[in-house]
Every structure is written in C-alpha cells, then in structure tokens.
Amino acid sequence: MNNSIGKVLDEFNKTLDEFMNKMILQFPFENKLKTYYSAFKVTKMCDKTIPIKIYMGGCLQFSDQIKNRDTEFFAKRKTFVNRMSVASSFTDDTGLVNYWDNLSVNSKNAIWDYVQTLFVMGEMFINKDSGMIQKINNVYNNISFNESMKTLNENNTFTEEFINKINK
C-alpha cells in the first residue's frame, strides 16, 4: 500500500472514530451506533481498509445526496427506505435516520461535514484502484452490515469479555 493511501486510511479511521464517539454522546441510547462503532473497532484491528469499504458501501449509491446535502439521505420516506433495504446505508446502519428530523440546523451541518469529509476520503481511496468500487459493491451487496452483526450476535461469535473490551 502506498504512503498516500496509508495516510488517507489513517485519517479516515481517525475521523470516523471521532464522529462515532460524538454521535454516541449525542444519542446514548441508539444501539445501532454502538454496534457500528464496535464493528468499526474490530474490523480496523483486522484490516484498516475494511472501515472505509463498509462506509463507502453504505454511501456509494447516495453520492449525489451526500454531495448536495440532500436531506433524503437521512429521510424515512417509503421509496428511500425500500431502496436502502436492498443494500443498507450508513444512515440506517447507524440509526441516524431515526433522529434527523428533530436535530437543530447546527447539528445537521456538523453531521453533514463529517459525512461529506468521510465520503471525500473514501473517494480518494477508491480512485487509487479502478476495481475497488466493484469489490465494495460485491461485498456490500452480498451481506448488509446489519445482517453481519446479527449473524455475529446469533452465533455468539464474540465472547462477552471481548465485546466489553472493544466497547470501552
């Protein structure tokens, strides 16, 4: 992996970690955020490219909404929700879709800043490998984030001690 990609990955992971921590403080009862954050920490330990691939897998099909700050990205409209259910989305995976309508303008702008910053870093990562988009789509379309976490929970893949350690 070349040095510039390594820097993008490090910055992406640092920014996503910061964003997730802020969102968990803002929405302490949203279990989806905590689950996403736990999965982020585990996957980052295994391979630091996985978090950016998961994020981009949940955002690629919504690039226009992200770039234009289109609130449909956070909407719960039936057509949007049906579209998300095929491959999932970052806002659904984290539960942010449930809070969007009740947030202040300042909070919405701060969230957009993070979402767009992470997306730009994701594009920088993808643009270095022409086959990366296809790889991300193949993985993301085969199993959604929620299905992955459900499988892990149902099969007791992680010990309670391990879960407690990564949730610290």
Regions found by a protein language model. Name each.
Residues 146-168:
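Alpha-helical oligomerization segments
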Residues 1-136, 140-149, 153:
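Terminal low-complexity "docking" segments
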